[in-house]
Amino acid sequence: MKKIKRSAADPDPVYPFGDEVPIPLPPFLVPGGGLTTDGLSLAVQTVDPLNVTLGGVGLKIGDGLSVVDGKLTSEAKIVADPPLQQSGDTLSLSTDSSMMVLPSGQLTINNLPSISVTSSGVGLVSPNAPLQLMSNGALQLSVGGGLTVGAQGSLQISTGVGVNVNAAGVLESYPLPPLVWDYSSKSLTLDIGPGLTVVNGKLQVIGATFSNQMSRMAPAPRADLQSNSIEPLPSPPSKTSLDIAEELQNDKGVSFAFQAREEELGAFTKRTLFAYSGDGLTGPFKAPASAELSSFLTAHPKGRWLIAFPLGTGIVSVDEGILTLEISRSLPEVGSGSSSTSLKVISIYFMDLFFPVPFIDRASHPAPRRSNNSRQLFHSKQRLFLKVKDFKKRSWYSSLFTLINLNIQECPELS
């Protein structure tokens, strides 16, 4: 019997696993539209983050995501640091009134009177005086006379002679003689000497009356010395030829103010030196002086000046431009009447006298030998000295020196 050969295209009904037999799909299933076939199996085709798990389509999720009640939920939260702020699902920028957001979404600065906004940046508008804008962009205060900028950048007052700023930062005035500051009444007063008084707030000469038409002075009683008398001397007109003031400071920071004045009084020249201590002084004071003040001090015949100030009495001298003030004990004025004094030298330190003729009858008062009980009166072209035993008994001396307007001080005997 002839064996019939089976066609290779026909499936083997006994063992059909060797060949792939296409399985016809229903017309409503189209492979490639999310479905795939594997032999007799029909499967769903997925890509990440989808997958097939336990016969179902699942979603792969990472940190920050979870499924709650069948809904995908995000566990991540946005934390905004200032100036950012979060309002619901919106993140925004917090600004004040000096800044604004343009409709285009750009951040800009509101125009202020003192600020200029240009394409090159933000700058200052040119300020009004006394402020000025420097070339480096810094704002500087322009100061004038009497003001300065200290080392710490603070505005300070420049002080001169008679004016100082105390530790509390208060501006104080230290007047020069004859003006005196009364601390009890906190007022400025005038220090007046013999022959002057204040009446109804006005300075007046004792014994003088004035009117609009003329002025007259009541004559003072004559002062007699035995058989000699002193006639009143005329008061020559004065002319100030020099008046300087300087504030000196030593290496310890102690300040002293000196005022030098030179007046032409007829036949003689009056040179006066005033000193004021802005700080306490317990020892010698040394500080450089200007050439003008040094020249004035060296004009003294002895090169030493006796001065009286609130702290006591001192001797002023100058050597190679260095002014030295030596403090001595406080001494009363001559003629104060406090007590009888021992032998002293009364020296007119502030005067250069030029008397054309002797004004004392020396024949009636010859100069004896020097002794503790002697009285000696002599004068020279530059200095006038007077040595007395008891000043109170010779009141005519005081009248004489008051008459010629001399400043007399009592000091220890000088060699």
UniProtKB/Swiss-Prot annotation:
It comes from the Viruses. Keywords: Capsid protein, Host nucleus, Host-virus interaction, Late protein, Viral attachment to host cell, Virion, Virus entry into host cell. GO terms for biological process: cell adhesion; symbiont entry into host cell; virion attachment to host cell. SUPFAM superfamilies: Fibre shaft of virus attachment proteins. Its main location: virion. It is found in: Virion; Host nucleus. Induction: Expressed in the late phase of the viral replicative cycle. One of its GO terms (cellular component) is viral capsid. All late proteins expressed from the major late promoter are produced by alternative splicing and alternative polyadenylation of the same gene giving rise to non-overlapping ORFs. A leader sequence is present in the N-terminus of all these mRNAs and is recognized by the viral shutoff protein to provide expression although conventional translation via ribosome scanning from the cap has been shut off in the host cell. Belongs to the adenoviridae fiber family. Homotrimer. Interacts (via N-terminal tail region) with pentons. The tail region anchors the fiber to penton base capsomers, whereas the shaft, built from several repeated motifs, allows the knob to protrude from the virion. Forms spikes that protrude from each vertex of the icosahedral capsid. Interacts with host receptor to provide virion initial attachment to target cell. Fiber proteins are shed during virus entry, when virus is still at the cell surface. This is Fiber protein.
